[in-house]
């Protein structure tokens, strides 16, 4: 498919209305890109107007009575870690991390433990290998895995899309027994550092949802930009 978004028409569909997986009292409806294959340049343009990826599906909330999902991104060259985030980095100096494009059984085993212990009340439970692959993998954009190790033991993974001018955080998970390390925070900080090293402009974090405690943490990384009807704005 031609990556020139100004000349290539894109087929977009709209889903049925169904119960929201983030806010109990709301209903959800999605705009869905109906293209089997995109390319990184076009996908990055879709990210910039609020779309996200789940597997090979590209979607954007268009809910009938709610606008709680706010696309959020970090301009990584301006990012300044908070005191708490600096402590997280300092407290995890004994850890090592590496980047790989390989999917491993060790990664999935860690994911399964994470979902069973941390998200047993959510839509991703019970975990399965098929669900894991459908959720994270995309045939036209292989993800990058950032693996974090403690004494050669895998304890955290961030799944990330690498795009021409940005990184996009898809999902992160970690060893529940190591929760005291604030590994979710650490993984975002590592992705931000990686984006800087690769001379990217943005790290996309998905949707900020203020009314959902598990989805409201992204405002802690500053400065950040929120996509509004007027465009991306610092908040």
UniProtKB/Swiss-Prot annotation:
Main location: cytoplasm
Catalytic activity, EC: 2.3.2.29
Catalytic activity: N-terminal L-glutamyl-[protein] + L-leucyl-tRNA(Leu) = N-terminal L-leucyl-L-glutamyl-[protein] + tRNA(Leu) + H(+); N-terminal L-aspartyl-[protein] + L-leucyl-tRNA(Leu) = N-terminal L-leucyl-L-aspartyl-[protein] + tRNA(Leu) + H(+)
Keywords: Acyltransferase, Cytoplasm, Transferase
Compartments in which it is found: Cytoplasm
InterPro entries xrefs: Acyl_CoA_acyltransferase, Asp_Glu_LeuTrfase, N-end_Aminoacyl_Trfase, N-end_Aminoacyl_Trfase_C, N-end_Aminoacyl_Trfase_N
Key word Acyltransferase present: yes
Database matches in Pfam families: ATE_C, ATE_N
UniProt GO BP: ubiquitin-dependent protein catabolic process via the N-end rule pathway
Signal peptide region: none
TM stretches of this protein: none
GO terms of molecular function: arginyl-tRNA--protein transferase activity; leucyl-tRNA--protein transferase activity
GO CC aspect terms: cytoplasm
Functional description taken from the UniProt entry: Functions in the N-end rule pathway of protein degradation where it conjugates Leu from its aminoacyl-tRNA to the N-termini of proteins containing an N-terminal aspartate or glutamate.
Homology family: Belongs to the R-transferase family. Bpt subfamily.
Protein name: Aspartate/glutamate leucyltransferase
